[in-house]
Design a protein with these regions (language model features):
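Generic "edge-of-domain/loop-turn" microfeature
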Residues: 97, 165-166
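Conserved acidic
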Residues: 102-110, 166, 209-210, 214
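Conserved G/P- and acidic residue-centered "switch" motifs that form tight phosphate/ATP-binding loops
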Residues: 137
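Short glycine/serine/threonine-rich phosphate/pyrophosphate-binding segments
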Residues: 140-143, 167-168
Length: 215
């Protein structure tokens, strides 16, 4: 599947089917790119290619699975579901309609990748619960929603930490979010701690950049 591809060598040795066992990590657009590459190579070599890919999260790397088979005409005759284990029996000599694109859209794939990555990171590192800060903004809201989906709302504690820079709306938004998600929450104000930090560092109360210092 690359410039230094070994398919010529195995075909010269008499191979009827090429099986490519991979740990190909996910990134945006990778599933379609992989399909196109496998289909092109199968048609070029006039041999079926079975592309078997690892699925699961490993620290910061996510493997999407999405294994596939291209026949000698370059048609994708099997496209496994992405981000989940998949077992299938396939007859290579039976013509089937092209299955390309069965894994769904790119936004859905990114969503599945994030959920799988969080779930496997927690499981493989031996923890079942998580604590995260909730500001009421878009970033922490998205993280909380993904964590609830990956680990279950009963395993998530959201901590709201109002500071001198927090608005009343951000707290209300955070409280509404945890009600909708069904997870546990706590409010731990940090205004007093922030003042202590300013005094210890002999800083005047900042204007610009104060939010970052509070964080």
């Amino acid at each position: 599947l690359y410039e230094s591809d070994p398919t010529d060598e195995v075909i010269a040795m008499g191979a009827d089917v090429i099986v490519s066992v991979n740990a190909s990590p996910y990134n945006k657009g990778k599933i379609k790119l992989r399909c196109d590459m496998v289909a092109h190579r199968a048609k070029l070599q006039k041999k079926p290619i079975v592309f078997v890919n690892l699925v699961g999260g490993n620290d910061g790397i996510i493997f999407d699975g999405a294994s596939l088979i291209a026949d000698e005409e370059g048609d994708i005759i099997l496209q496994a579901a992405a981000f989940e284990e998949f077992v299938e029996t396939v007859e290579l000599d039976v013509r089937k309609p092209d299955a390309r694109g069965i894994t769904g859209g790119e936004i859905a794939a990114i969503h599945q990748a994030l959920v799988l990555g969080i779930r496997d990171y927690a499981a493989k590192n031996g923890f079942k619960k998580a604590v995260l800060g909730l500001s009421g903004g878009i970033d922490s809201t998205l993280v909380a929603a993904l964590a609830c989906e990956a680990m279950g709302p009963e395993n998530l504690l959201c901590v709201m930490m109002p500071s001198p820079f927090s608005s009343e709306g951000s707290i209300k938004d955070s409280e509404e979010l945890v009600r909708n998600l069904g997870c546990e929450s706590r409010i731990e104000p940090i205004s007093a701690t922030f003042e202590v930090l300013l005094n210890q560092m002999n800083l005047h109360k900042p204007t610009k950049g104060g939010e970052s210092l509070a964080a």
